[in-house]
Amino acid sequence: MLYSLIVNLVDQFGFLNVFKYLTFRTGLAMFTSMFVVLLIGTPFIKFFSARQILNPIRDDGPSDHIIKKIGTPTMGGVLILLGLFSGILLWGDLTNYHIWFLLFIVSSYGSLGAYDDYKKIKFKNSSGISFRFKIISQIVIALVGILGLAHFSQNTELTNLYFPFFKNLIINLGWFFIPFSIFIIVGSSNAVNLTDGLDGLATVPVILVAGCFAFISYVTGNIVFSEYLNIPYLEGMGEVAVFCGSIIGACLGFLWFNAPPAKIFMGDTGSLALGGSLGAIGIITKHEFVLAITGGLFVLEAVSVIVQVISFKLTGKRIFRMAPIHHHFEKKGWSESTVVIRFWIISIILAMIGLATLKLR
């Protein structure tokens, strides 16, 4: 929006040429998103508290959660999305179809999450919408987004699957690209959703993954860097770095209020939207496996739930004291802050490994 206006004035005012630089606009998007969240965060929390938009606590969860977290507002994802939209709409190139694809995914999943949060608040329980309705809705949204992407995309690499550590190992998925992409988006969305169970636990890993993909999208969209790193060059992909910058800024601003002890939770509004957007970014940058590495904490949380459910149905026994796995460690006696910080450390290590795969080929 503002970027488009400024670009038209570059010929008259040469100093405005700096706004054409992706790195500069990524930084602007990040700081804009962060500033918006910090600016409206406190009145937002007060408004939600007054309106009793509070987070329902699981009855079967750790006992201290009932004491510590009851009365904390939820749907903080609205804050994140307002910040994210501010950054990308002001500083992003809105003629880039990748941006519109990502905006569709993040807004649609955010709306679904908001509806889920609304149901939880209205009926004062942690169930929300049914699992079947949520999954079907997520699949439909992802399908519409992928079909739209395939229609408008000029990217000949779109259906290719690349593997980290291998230079020439490429598989063309053909039409299987569609269900594969749906799986990535839906899986990523739910994995972040499952991780968001402790104060700040999901926020920092999202920042780290978005930071990794800001770099990945930048080098993927640069013909010189992509050739040097032997990764596919994707024209226009650099603009995704601006979107990632908006995610980072919005989450940094939100972390100010979400750090232990949290003054607000992101709820499904934030977790579904952020997870879906990370999955979508992994797909369009053609780094799906790197997404699984950098977002390995999300994968671990999701797998712990799947394993727990399968084990209980087949044997009647639970492998973990409670799933997702962060609650398992709480049940073992770890304090919430210990779990959160150690999981952040794991995320930092995984982010470094993920970035290292770009060079180790």
Predicted regions and their residues:
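Alpha-helical transmembrane segments and immediately membrane-proximal extracytoplasmic
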Residues: 57-74, 98, 214, 224-228
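Mid-bilayer segments of alpha-helical transmembrane spans in multi-pass integral membrane proteins
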Residues: 109-115, 139-151
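Alpha-helical transmembrane segments
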Residues: 2-43, 82-111, 151-152, 157-161, ...
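Juxtamembrane helix-capping/reentrant segments at transmembrane boundaries
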Residues: 57-72, 126-137, 326, 331
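Membrane-interface helix-loop junction between the first two transmembrane segments
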Residues: 42-60
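Select subsegments of transmembrane alpha-helices in polytopic membrane proteins
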Residues: 69-81, 133-141, 336-346
